[in-house]
């Protein structure tokens, strides 16, 4: 929904457009690592602040990228649906979303890939997860476990990349 309201051509009101854009800018203004530190100080150590930071920043980026995808959809397709008497919601459902779907999917898959890597970094600040295990292995000089963790991260990223290619080939 934030992407729809942050797109100039689908936002129902200019004030709402600017408010949502500013909220998305705030969410993206700081990297996940900084938001994780903020959330660690608010809720303590563990995986929750890392998840909160990823959700916060991801929402900001997805909202912006999806709004930009919506803003560049083919005007002729949208006008064709509007010419049938379709309202705002029907225009979104039958023109804007189908035209923007390939960009949406590409963006979501990229963000998913990015978040897997970002989750590793968040462990450095005590936000839990595989990043924490990576740091502990380094601190304890447990290089066998360190190599295993790096290999696991590589395998997950590779699987996500292949999954992304399959999805893109079916949709785009």
Predicted stretch roles:
Residues 2-36, 65-68:
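Cytoplasmic-entry segments and transmembrane alpha-helices of multi-pass inner-membrane transporters
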Residues 9-17, 46-47, 103, 142:
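Membrane-helix interface segments
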Residues 18-28, 68-83, 94, 135-139, ...:
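Short amphipathic alpha-helical coupling elements at transmembrane boundaries
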Residues 24-55:
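Generic hydrophobic transmembrane alpha-helix motif, especially the helices
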Residues 30, 34-38, 100, 104-112, ...:
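Hydrophobic alpha-helical segments of membrane proteins
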Residues 41, 113, 118-153, 172:
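Glycine-rich helix-loop "coupling/hinge" segments at transmembrane-helix boundaries
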Residues 45-96, 102-114, 162:
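Membrane-cytosol interface at the C-terminal ends of specific transmembrane alpha-helices
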Residues 106-109, 147-172:
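C-terminal transmembrane helix and the adjacent membrane-cytosol boundary/short C-terminal tail
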């Amino acid at each position: 929904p934030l992407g729809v309201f942050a797109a100039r051509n689908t936002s129902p009101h200019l004030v709402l457009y600017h408010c949502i854009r500013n909220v998305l800018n705030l969410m993206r203004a700081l990297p996940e690592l900084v938001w994780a530190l903020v959330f660690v100080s608010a809720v303590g150590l563990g995986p929750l602040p890392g998840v909160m930071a990823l959700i916060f920043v991801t929402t900001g980026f997805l909202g912006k990228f999806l709004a930009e995808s919506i803003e560049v959809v083919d005007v002729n397709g949208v006008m064709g649906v509007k010419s049938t008497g379709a309202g705002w919601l029907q225009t979104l459902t039958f023109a804007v979303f189908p035209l923007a779907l390939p960009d949406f999917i590409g963006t979501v898959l990229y963000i998913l890939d990015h978040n897997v890597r970002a989750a590793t970094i968040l462990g450095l600040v005590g936000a839990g997860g595989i990043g924490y295990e990576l740091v502990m292995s380094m601190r304890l000089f447990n290089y066998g476990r360190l190599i295993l963790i790096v290999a696991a991260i590589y395998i997950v990223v590779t699987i996500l990349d292949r999954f992304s290619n399959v999805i893109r080939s079916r949709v785009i």
